[in-house]
């Protein structure tokens, strides 16, 4: 992966080098500067960042060029940037990205960025005090593919599944936009505060749901990218794989453990994440005593597409739907 990224960056630098001699000629022939250059160019990597930025921008969204890189359903962990993606990052005014292991390519791209005045918001840095290490809970299958540096700590990248974290990042977005566009400071601050009130109200609903629930454990026959969500509300969990795992085939031992936990805890549901094929969940249920559990889907927002956004999907709408699913599972 690292060699592939290095190769892509080399291609990108070659494209940039070839284009520079012709830039002045193009401008002279046109007689005017491209009007798109007058807009702030904001690039986000994933959907939550994109939607939070839209919320903070409010009516100012029409005056910026806002881009979401992963807009075709590609998962953050499997995304491989094309030259056009690296060029978008290199030429933007503000880049908002997660900053975890999956974003190593961005750190490399930033070193070769065309815009030396670019501002960045690294979610892992903004949320430094709240970042959690990946954990392996009882029954969770180890990642057989391993990592390049086994002695390094691995941190959970899925920070956006926490409403608390969302609020903190919105502050950072509003602050950065204010630095870049001070004339509209009041708009950004007001929009951020209004959005944070919605986050807070939804957070209260989550808290009430958990406090009045008859169950407090979730079981995932899948990857588990919801550590930040469950920790916010004191929920317990079991899962086949960690959130960043590359595994997709559960062992007999893992299946057996999860099925026994379903029986032991009297769970009425087994969870998967969006776009799962349900095979592991079905196998777990087939190995329980009653074999009548529901398969429920919790949306981690790792694969939201541009079409879904056009159809009205928002961060809040996904988290509201997730709350409905949790209510069903916990009662």
Where does each model-flagged region fall?
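Extracytoplasmic metal-acquisition and chelation regions
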Residues: 4-7, 14-331
């Amino acid at each position: 992966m690292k060699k592939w990224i290095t190769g892509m960056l080399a291609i990108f630098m070659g494209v940039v080098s070839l284009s520079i001699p012709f830039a002045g000629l193009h401008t002279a022939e046109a007689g005017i500067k491209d009007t798109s250059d007058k807009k702030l160019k904001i690039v986000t990597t994933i959907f939550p960042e994109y939607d939070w930025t839209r919320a903070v921008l409010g009516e100012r969204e029409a005056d910026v060029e806002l881009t979401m890189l992963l807009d075709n359903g590609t998962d953050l962990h499997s995304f491989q940037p094309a030259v056009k993606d690296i060029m978008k990052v290199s030429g933007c005014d503000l880049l908002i990205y997660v900053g975890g292991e999956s974003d190593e390519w961005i750190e490399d791209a930033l070193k070769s960025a065309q815009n030396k005045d670019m501002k960045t918001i690294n979610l892992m840095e903004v949320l430094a005090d709240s970042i959690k290490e990946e954990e392996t809970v009882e029954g969770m299958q180890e990642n057989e593919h391993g990592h390049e540096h086994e002695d390094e700590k691995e941190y959970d990248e899925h920070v956006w599944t926490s409403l608390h974290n969302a609020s903190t990042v919105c502050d950072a977005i509003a602050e950065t936009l204010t630095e870049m566009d001070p004339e509209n400071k009041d708009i950004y601050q007001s929009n951020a505060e209004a959005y944070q009130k919605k986050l807070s109200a939804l957070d209260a609903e989550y808290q009430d749901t958990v406090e009045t629930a008859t169950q407090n454990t979730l079981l995932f026959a899948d990857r588990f990218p919801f550590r930040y969500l469950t920790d916010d509300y004191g929920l317990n969990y079991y899962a086949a794989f960690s959130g960043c795992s590359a595994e997709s085939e559960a062992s007999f031992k893992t299946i057996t453990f999860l099925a026994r936990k379903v029986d032991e805890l009297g769970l009425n549901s087994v969870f998967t994440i969006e776009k799962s094929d349900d095979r592991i969940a079905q196998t777990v249920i087939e190995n329980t005593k009653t074999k009548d559990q529901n398969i429920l889907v919790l949306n981690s927002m790792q694969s939201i597409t541009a079409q879904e956004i056009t159809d009205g999907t928002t961060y809040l709408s996904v988290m509201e739907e997730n709350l409905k699913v949790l209510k069903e599972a916990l009662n």
